[in-house]
């Protein structure tokens, strides 16, 4: 690293220019600052892209109306802004001048904007900056206008994260200066999506109109393509809706649906056999019922006969006993034909019932 002595020795031959021609001084200052930043780009870590925003220029420029203090005062309010915003604030103020670098190069002039692009008040304060040039060459201080001019031009130099200027053609100033999220250009950019969204909103409306216009001829085409239905056939293709208005039984007389004579005779025979079998079952049931009835009557008759054979009878020949008999005894007396019994039995023993 160079010492301030060698740097001052190297710059002894330079003479401050007259206030009438301040553009050469500004060019030399910007060239020095640019070549100072080039050898240190590889050594320093990259800072976030929002640190070197153009919004910092009005704060550090000597002609800025936003700063109440003068540029040469070095107020403590302005130093924290320089330390936090610009990458040069972290460097030693004694390292502002490069070592063994030419004072001007074509690449540096391509990257430098014209003096007309600066603020209008910056040209008024150039005379003061030129008057203090010898002091800044000997011993630069962080509060002097030389240091402020370097920091102001440092905002125009390429960012440490960007490539160093080379033989390629230079990019526009807007691309070289990094943008910060709070910069006025970034504030104007969010308004672009709504502007881009407005055509998007208007886009579907013509499509709908085109679709509606396309649907109109499309709706006419099917009407024209409908085939003509031949006379005698229904529109829906249902055969039972014929123009002749015949009955369904007459329309469905197909050959597969007709039954043969043998099939008809067979079905008739089956029906007859079923009826005969049902009649036979009824007759069998009636026969069983009659047989049961006869058995019951025979059983009754046989029981009565057995009772008569087993009873003891007494024939009452004296009618006076009947008169003297009580009602209970008269209930048990019956009149019977005893002729058969008398014939079977001997006459000395007549049949009587007690």
UniProtKB/Swiss-Prot annotation:
Coiled coil: 274-317
PTM sites of type Citrulline: 336
Post-translational modification: Citrullinated by PADI4.
Keyword Aminoacyl-tRNA synthetase assigned: no
InterPro entries: CCDC86, Cgr1-like
Primary site of residence: nucleus
Pfam families xrefs: Cgr1
Subcellular location: Nucleus; Chromosome; Nucleus, Nucleolus
Protein name: Coiled-coil domain-containing protein 86
Organism listed in the record: Bos taurus
Lineage, top ranks: Eukaryota, Metazoa, Chordata, Craniata, Vertebrata
Protein encoded by which gene: CCDC86
């Amino acid at each position: 690293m160079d010492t301030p002595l060698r740097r001052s020795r190297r710059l002894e031959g330079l003479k401050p220019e007259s206030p009438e021609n301040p553009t050469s001084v500004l060019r030399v200052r910007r060239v020095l600052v640019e070549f100072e930043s080039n050898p240190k780009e590889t050594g320093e870590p990259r800072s976030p892209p929002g640190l070197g925003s153009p919004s910092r220029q009005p704060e550090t420029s000597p002609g800025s109306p936003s700063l109440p203090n003068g540029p040469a005062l070095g107020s403590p309010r302005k130093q924290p802004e320089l330390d936090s915003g610009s990458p040069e604030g972290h460097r030693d103020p004694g390292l502002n001048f490069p070592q063994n670098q030419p004072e001007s190069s074509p690449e540096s002039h391509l990257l430098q904007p014209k003096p007309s692009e600066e603020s209008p008040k910056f040209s008024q304060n150039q005379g003061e900056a030129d008057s203090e040039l010898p002091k800044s060459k000997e011993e630069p201080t962080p509060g002097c206008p030389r240091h402020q001019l370097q920091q102001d031009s440092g905002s125009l130099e390429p960012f440490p994260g960007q490539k160093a200027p080379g033989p390629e053609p230079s990019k526009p100033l807007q691309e070289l200066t990094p943008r910060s999220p709070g910069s006025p250009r970034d504030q104007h950019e969010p308004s672009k999506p709504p502007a881009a969204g407005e055509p998007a909103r208007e886009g579907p409306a013509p499509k709908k109109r085109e679709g509606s216009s396309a649907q109109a001829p499309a709706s006419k085409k099917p009407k024209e393509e409908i085939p003509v239905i031949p006379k005698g056939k229904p529109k829906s293709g249902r055969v039972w809706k014929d123009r002749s208005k015949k009955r369904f039984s007459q329309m469905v007389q197909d050959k597969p649906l007709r039954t043969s004579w043998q099939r008809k005779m067979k079905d008739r025979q089956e029906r007859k056999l079923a009826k005969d079998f049902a009649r036979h079952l009824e007759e069998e049931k009636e026969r069983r019922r009659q047989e049961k009835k006869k058995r019951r009557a025979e059983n009754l008759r046989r029981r009565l006969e057995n009772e008569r054979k087993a009873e003891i009878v007494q024939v009452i020949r004296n009618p006076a006993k009947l008169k003297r008999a009580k009602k209970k005894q008269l209930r048990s007396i019956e009149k019977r034909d005893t002729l058969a019994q008398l014939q079977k039995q001997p006459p000395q023993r007549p049949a009587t019932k007690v």
